[in-house]
UniProtKB/Swiss-Prot annotation:
Family as reported in the entry's similarity comment: Belongs to the UBALD family.
Name of the protein in question: UBA-like domain-containing protein 2
Region (Disordered), start-end ranges: 120-166
Taxonomy, superkingdom: Eukaryota
Annotated organism of origin: Xenopus tropicalis
Disulfide bridge map: none
Length: 166
């Protein structure tokens, strides 16, 4: 790999580490270099260090994980990252039409799974008007609950298996 590609790969890994761990880029770079650019190894080292209550490992800064279920994200850092995203997106939008579609649903997106159209009743109500009948001609597969269950006697097989265990 060329030197530029190697530098780019390292920079991407540093950015991913900052996002995953919520720490400063210089600390991410130090940990990644110490782990010979093994992302998981460096991440493990970071979280093990941050769980040690003493500050003797890093007396200048104690960088704890900020985006875990137990701790809220570090809002100044998050806001700074969002402002960087906004400026980079505005640059991309002028040259790349695909960037403007990034937040749009894909072309095969089916809005019926989330809500019913205003002129039709929801599918789960019994048909009470002719407009509901029109929905059945779209030939969308009807949702099956639970997922992956087949209408061919799945519950009976499960009951037979449970009866056999008793």
């Amino acid at each position: 790999m060329s030197v530029n590609m190697e530098e780019l790969r390292h920079q991407v890994m540093i950015n991913q580490f900052v996002l995953a761990a919520g720490c400063a880029a210089d600390q991410a770079k130090q940990l990644l270099q110490a782990a010979h650019w093994q992302f998981e190894t460096a991440l493990s080292a970071f979280f093990q260090e941050s769980n040690v209550p003493s500050a003797q490992h890093h007396p200048h800064m104690m960088c704890t994980p900020s985006n875990t279920p137990a701790t809220p994200p570090n809002f100044p850092d998050a806001l700074a990252m969002f402002s960087k995203l906004r400026t980079s997106e505005s640059l991309q939008n002028s040259s790349s039409p695909a960037a403007s579609n990034a937040c749009s649903p894909p072309g095969n997106f089916n809005p019926y799974w989330a809500s019913s159209p205003p002129n039709q009743q929801p599918v789960w109500l019994p048909p009470a008007s002719p407009t509901t009948h029109l929905h059945h001609h779209h030939h969308h597969p009807q949702p099956v609950w639970p997922p992956n269950s087949q209408p061919t006697g799945g519950p009976q097989k499960a009951m037979a298996a449970m009866d056999g265990q008793r």
